Swiss-Prot record:
Species classification: Eukaryota, Metazoa, Chordata, Craniata, Vertebrata
TM annotation in the entry: none
Protein keywords: Cell membrane, GTP-binding, Hydrolase, Lipoprotein, Magnesium, Membrane, Metal-binding, Methylation, Nucleotide-binding, Prenylation
Compartments, record wording: Cell membrane
Protein name (record): Ras-related protein Rab-19
Motif placement: Switch 1: 39-54
């Protein structure tokens, strides 16, 4: 497909550019989350990521064009050396776990340690509990995730479902707002969380028991 120089220039015109890495154990649904964010499409069967996959999408945040580079990393041990090299230039990290598999939640401290060891200082970290559509198979309480996030000083916890389009957009909008706020801290001195509607009106799961799916720390 051919793009004119003017089309390329328009695509390259942005106010902010942020690099975000998506990490976590294998088969927690990281690729499904990224694909849904990119195209709004959910694919039931996804092959495991080999090394690192790269996706770009621009968001309009309060009249500013924010280009989000999302790096979907493989969770398998044999790819760790490759994926660790991508930590260094990341502005933010999203750690994903599968709320139907307790072991993926228990791995979160390991992933936080990886970020602290290989990432830059002051990387913004968010936690997402994926597959919240499978609430009847839940093995991780939302309250446990909030407690862990508070312990490690993470930005927020959201429960997501790529299959049912729950909180996928909100994850990246919240992250973009926080990164903009931190980038402009010397001007505004406030966190993006101060003005986010989700804080005062938590998202509720439509199917199954009524539960909060978003908390900020």
């Amino acid at each position: 497909m051919h793009f004119s120089s003017s089309a390329r220039a328009a695509d390259e015109n942005f106010d902010y550019l942020f690099k975000i890495i998506l990490i976590g154990d294998s088969n927690v649904g990281k690729t499904c989350v990224v694909q849904h964010f990119k195209s709004g499409v959910y694919t039931e069967t996804q092959q495991n990521t080999i090394g690192v996959d790269f996706t770009v999408r621009s968001l309009d945040i309060d009249g500013k064009k924010v280009k989000m580079q999302v790096w979907d990393t493989a969770g398998q041990e044999r790819f760790r050396t490759i994926t660790q090299s991508y930590y260094r230039s990341a502005h933010a990290a999203i750690i994903a776990y599968d709320l139907t598999r307790r072991s993926t939640f228990e791995s979160i401290p390991h992933w936080i340690h990886e970020i602290e060891k290989y990432g830059a200082a002051n990387v913004v970290i968010m936690l997402i509990g994926n597959k919240c559509d499978l609430w009847e198979k839940r093995h991780v309480l939302f309250e446990d995730a909030c407690t862990l996030a508070e312990k490690y000083g993470l930005l927020a916890v959201l429960e997501t479902s790529a299959k049912e389009s729950k909180n996928i957009e909100e994850v990246f909008v919240l992250m973009a707002k926080e990164l903009i706020a931190r980038n402009s801290l010397h001007l505004y001195g406030e966190s993006a969380l101060n003005g986010l509607p989700l804080d005062s009106s938590p998202v509720l799961m439509a199917q199954g028991p009524s539960e909060k799916t978003h908390c900020t720390c």
